[in-house]
Amino acid sequence: MTNRRVQNIKRKRGPVKSKKVVCDGITFASGLEKYMYVALKEAKIKADYEGCTFVLQEGFEFKNESYERQSNGKGKLVNRGCKKILPIKYTPDFISHDFIIETKGRANESFPMRWKMFKKYVNHKMSHVTLYKPQNQKECDEVVKLILIKRKRK
């Protein structure tokens, strides 16, 4: 019997492609969102699914030149300035009067920065709200328990 070394090869993951799921006539962006919805519903906790979009940074007119390659890094430098920059927006998965839930299995590359910006927004404009970010079904169940405990204390 020979000893073989097993190498852990970390494969590069591609973009997140979660499957849309329908429940109660609502189309959810992922199975985890559906799971959270069902868990909230069973606990009789009311929350709107993608009920509100927040503008984290207003759009603006960029008047300078800005020479950049395409986002894929190929091609030659092209002036991508002198145009309107769109606002940065964020739509949480579930929102209620006292909590906001963002279910996130695997985050895309822009999410961590958007989440930090949203936390700052909440800190300044919605200090009464508690944020939850479950990443699996077990954490969704824990979020429901935490919400119920917090509401009983009031």
Regions found by a protein language model. Name each.
Residues 1-154:
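Electrostatic, structured charged patches in enzyme active sites and in nucleic-acid/phosphate-binding
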